[in-house]
């Protein structure tokens, strides 16, 4: 053992050495992009790491206790373009802290409690475009030393302590400023003097966000003649009177987009009156957006729309419009959005100048009403759960100019016409709506100009081969999640010579016609994933001279045949074969070698695994050894024979093991009394019936029966098979078998049933009671031959969910369970008395 003095002499220098080590000297940063992007987030760094290359362009140092930034703190990174210093506990930034960062375009200082900010703190940032100083305890824009940042485009100082909206003179030196975020500050009043800079030097592209400021007063004419790109005022007003006064204070403003309203979780107005918006007449607005305003009547809804009559673009989000059936006519709207609003029924629309209508995710929608929109070019009616009794033609929409139609995520759409009068359509989306009669006739015959079609997950069953006739200009076709007759893909793409993208995933396809893709010379992307293809016959893909991406993942592909590999499109750049059932056997040696040779072509080739033979299941396909296929036939034959013999012996031993367990149990428990009246065999899918009906009526009835249930009576930590035999069969007088569709499809249930047969043979007292829970198809029942024969030869109980049927069922079942049960009058009386006592207590 080392003497104490010697041990201390060894440990003290080691501890001194370790104490000198800093986390930054351990190279803890994550290299996202070599020599370019590094992430050092939340590594407890106390200073800027020195081991990061000087070529770094993006550096994330957020959530490190840097405390302060001294002069030339980042001089080692002259190429830096993005710097994130969020929540680094920075309290002081000295002069020239960022000196030398001539290429820095984005600087993020969010969440730093800055107390001292030198006048030259941001010097040297000659290319800075985005500065984020959210939650930095900034109290005034005038004290923010950024007047020299002439290239600045975005300034975000939200969630600070700014009380004055006065824009400093240095804003006149920022001609490129496009976005100023002052939201969630302490601004209450806005005067003409505050905006003097904008009066002197207009910033025409400036977007100004003043949301979540407790505005109380805007001086009249403060915004007069000012031009803004966007102004956002959300959750600013405590009362409708303040809102009305402030909107009147905006008189004379010229703004491309005005956003008013509240936030979903920041509601201040107790009520809303559309009179507050009347002051909008004094503004010049191109686009208006109102969000999260409620608590007003249907009349107010009409008044609201009347207030917006002179605006060309309207967007209403998350409003309660109530019973607004008839929209006002004669408005000059060109663009109208109604998103996530509650409105009782689809409104009648007659707007002659409207070109774009977005009506999505609205509540209380049922059916679509005809509209009269002669100038409409863009129509989005998605996510409304609408039903369309007739679709689609000029008669439904009263327009011939439509180019974009989105009816996705709705209810039932009946295809009654082939888009007569809508020949200008270029984009059509039906995904996740239920299409009816879509495969009865050439429904798309008139759409010569259509370029995009999505009928994914529309419950379409393709029977008619001319379903896509007429789509001569189509470039993208998505039809995932549908089905084909006999799970066979025929030649239904006969006129789509311009098609570039085709999605046939999740269509249950098993075979592909040799001519399926023969007329698709421009196809570049083909998705055949999540189907049931057993062999990938490459002959149908041979005409696809432009194919670059082929996805055949999640199929049941065993292999390719050697002759099929010769038909591979030479243009193919990516082939996805992951999640298939590859056979790693010598019969497909050529294919397995081809996989090794095509590693660059195959997606995630290292994840291709063998499914058969069993001894190679889960092994990488790349690990298959071709040398094993050269062994002599004698060795192969002998090996196969040995494997078969071992397998047979193993099966016999397995079967014999359970017979021994049963036989031993019968000898052990044969003379004693059984603990349980019956062991219940059932599928876990039928557990609700077992718990709520079987257990309740038998264990709580008179006389009570004790059932053995796996979820309650099996011993934890013991193998399932051992529990079934020792706790289930050996300790029970009888066995109840609950037969259902789930039972027949469950391997565990069939295993328990087979053991029950052996148990009945070995035990003279044993009895099996069959309960058929639901009507079973004979084709399904014949899958279990012994069970089918047994049910034909023996009586069984059949569950009927009716008063008479239940009475007969429980009477017959109790009679069967009483057979051989030791009689205990006292126990029966006690049970009856207990039931009577419970009934009186509940009363």
From Swiss-Prot:
Residue ranges constituting the LRRNT domain according to the UniProt record: 24-54
Ranges that cross the membrane: 634-654
Gene Ontology MF: a single term: NAD+ nucleosidase activity, cyclic ADP-ribose generating
Which comment does the entry carry about domains? The TIR domain mediates interaction with NOX4.
Please describe what this protein does: Transmembrane receptor that functions as a pattern recognition receptor recognizing pathogen- and damage-associated molecular patterns (PAMPs and DAMPs) to induce innate immune responses via downstream signaling pathways. At the plasma membrane, cooperates with LY96 to mediate the innate immune response to bacterial lipopolysaccharide (LPS). Also involved in LPS-independent inflammatory responses triggered by free fatty acids, such as palmitate, and Ni(2+). Mechanistically, acts via MYD88, TIRAP and TRAF6, leading to NF-kappa-B activation, cytokine secretion and the inflammatory response.
Name-wise, this protein is Toll-like receptor 4
Taken from the record's topology, the Cytoplasmic segments are 655-843
Repeat (LRR) residue spans along the chain: 55-76, 79-100, 103-124, 127-148, 151-172, 176-197, 205-225, 227-247, 353-374, 375-398, 401-423, 424-445, 449-459, 473-496, 498-519, 522-543, 546-569
This protein's membrane topology, according to the annotation, is: Single-pass type I membrane protein
UniProt keyword list: Cell membrane, Cell projection, Disulfide bond, Endosome, Glycoprotein, Immunity, Inflammatory response, Innate immunity, Leucine-rich repeat, Membrane, NAD, Receptor, Repeat, Signal, Transmembrane, Transmembrane helix, Ubl conjugation
Instruction: Give the start-end ranges of region Disordered.
Output: 824-843
For bias type Basic and acidic residues, the affected ranges are: 832-843
Which residue intervals are topologically Extracellular? Answer: 24-633
Q: Where is the signal peptide?
A: 1-23
State the oligomer form and interacting partners: Belongs to the lipopolysaccharide (LPS) receptor, a multi-protein complex containing at least CD14, LY96 and TLR4. Binding to bacterial LPS leads to homodimerization. Interacts with LY96 via the extracellular domain. Interacts with MYD88 and TIRAP via their respective TIR domains. Interacts with NOX4. Interacts with CNPY3 and HSP90B1; this interaction is required for proper folding in the endoplasmic reticulum. Interacts with MAP3K21; this interaction leads to negative regulation of TLR4 signaling.
